[in-house]
Design a protein with these regions (language model features):
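Subset of outer-membrane beta-barrel
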Residues: 1-297
Length: 297
């Protein structure tokens, strides 16, 4: 169900599955959780909800560490170097002045889609609550997704943050996010005699306003980044996945699924130059009816 965040136009065969996901990043410094489920707001009008949380604890606040007393080592004399915010000769840091704070982000995503001609069209709405130290903010956003099966392959694209998204802080500051476009291609290759299915995937992200040094292709302010991946499924129960994210880092995963329960594990290797540790993601999907049946025995 997390696919509805990627493209609200996606449709899945089994709509009764609840998904629970936990992700640990940077060797456990950042932890994220996800819950996804389907709810009919009225007959034959399902909305796919996603609840997300991300927390970062013990973020050091070093702003008061510097003993910025200047060359004479005495506060209040206004000598050379005092109060300039730079560690000058004779000054030092006071480790006892380190303070710690945390960051918490809560998100709610709702996706709704309908058939339109030969396309599946979906709308995704986003609500974000952001808390960092004693500051807080609220954000909203809108995505528009399209998906279609062609002869032998699948194609989808998403217009993100249209017309734009924004986060409003309690002091009136607004963080704006300009629109971008994601395109995805998938060509299923079936080897029925062997029970195998291969799913090569190509995703292209076009951002007209946010070119960076890490961009695969850049034109002026525009950046184009690519994601490639391959999924191999055996007997529709066992899946092995490998790919490359927009930063060029290799990712991989394995999944096991049955009719009413599934388990997945994802892994993102550490950038050899960062020293920040690996990322791990674990997902459990289950049917609520199956869970009630097991508990009531």
């Amino acid at each position: 169900m997390g696919g509805f965040i990627a493209n609200p136009a996606f449709q899945f065969d089994n709509h009764s599955i609840v998904e629970l996901t936990h992700q640990s990043r940077f060797a456990g410094m950042v932890n994220s959780d996800y819950v996804g489920f389907r709810k009919e707001i009225r007959k034959n009008v399902p909305v796919h909800f996603s609840i997300l949380y991300e927390g970062i604890g013990k973020i050091p606040d070093t702003r008061s560490m510097l003993l910025d007393w200047g060359a004479d080592g005495v506060f209040g004399t206004q000598d050379s170097g005092e109060g300039n915010g730079i560690i000058d000769e004779g000054e030092r840091l006071n480790v006892d002045s380190i303070k710690y704070f945390s960051q918490h982000i809560f998100g709610l995503h709702g996706a709704f889609n309908k058939a339109w001609h030969q396309w599946q069209v979906g709308i995704g709405t986003k609500l974000l609550l952001h808390f960092i130290d004693d500051h807080h903010a609220i954000g909203i956003g809108l995505d528009l997704g399209f998906f279609r099966h062609f002869n032998g392959f699948n194609f989808g694209f998403v217009l993100r943050n249209i017309p734009s998204s924004g986060i409003l802080w309690e002091n009136g500051t607004i963080e704006g996010t300009l629109p971008n476009i994601d395109l995805g291609f998938n060509v299923p290759i079936n080897m029925i005699n062997y029970g195998l299915e291969f799913n090569p995937i190509l995703s292209i992200r076009v951002n007209p306003y946010n070119r960076s040094l890490d961009s695969d292709i850049g034109f002026g302010t525009m950046s184009i980044d690519t994601v490639i991946g391959m999924e191999c499924k055996y007997d529709n129960n066992l899946a092995v996945r490998i790919g490359r994210n927009p930063l060029g880092t290799m990712v991989g995963g394995i999944g096991i699924s049955w009719k009413r329960i599934s388990m997945d594990y994802g892994f993102l290797s550490e950038d050899s130059n960062s020293g920040l540790g690996n990322h791990h993601l674990i997902t459990l999907g289950f049917s609520p009816d199956w869970l009630v049946e097991k508990v009531s025995r």
